[in-house]
Swiss-Prot record:
HAMAP family: Ribosomal_uS10. It comes from Corynebacterium jeikeium (strain K411). Keywords: Ribonucleoprotein, Ribosomal protein. This is Small ribosomal subunit protein uS10. GO terms for molecular function: structural constituent of ribosome; tRNA binding. Gene3D superfamilies: Ribosomal protein S10 domain. The gene is rpsJ.
Length: 101
C-alpha cells in the first residue's frame, strides 16, 4: 500500500474523549511502522438553542443552551496491512464518531 493515505476524522461532544481517542490511534499507528500526521484540531462547531423559560408568556425570559462538537483529523501515510489490521481492532469510546476515508 505504498503511496497511499488513510484519513481519519473524529467527532465528539467531549474534548477529553476525543483527545484520548486520537492519542490511542496515533500510538497504535506508530507502533505498526506507519507515519502519522496529526491529530489536527479542526474548528469546533457550536450550536446555540434559545428556549423560552415560561410555557405561556414572559417572552423576554429566555434560556440559552449550547452544544459544541469537537473535531480532529489524523492522516496515516504509507499504511501497511499490519496498520490496517491494528486500526480495525482498536477499541474507542461510543461517544466518539469515527469516519475513515
Amino acid at each position: 500500500m505504498a503511496g497511499q493515505k488513510i484519513r481519519i476524522r473524529l467527532k465528539a461532544y467531549d474534548h477529553e474523549a476525543i483527545d484520548a481517542s486520537a492519542k490511542k490511534i496515533v500510538e497504535t499507528v506508530t507502533r505498526t511502522g506507519a507515519r502519522v500526521v496529526g491529530p489536527v484540531p479542526l474548528p469546533t462547531e457550536k450550536n446555540v438553542y434559545c428556549v423560552i423559560r415560561s410555557p405561556h408568556k414572559y417572552k423576554d425570559s429566555r434560556e440559552h443552551f449550547e452544544m459544541r462538537t469537537h473535531k480532529r483529523l489524523i492522516d496515516i501515510l504509507d499504511p501497511t496491512p499490519k496498520t490496517v489490521d491494528a486500526l480495525m481492532r482498536i477499541d474507542l469510546p461510543a461517544s466518539v464518531d469515527v469516519n475513515i476515508q
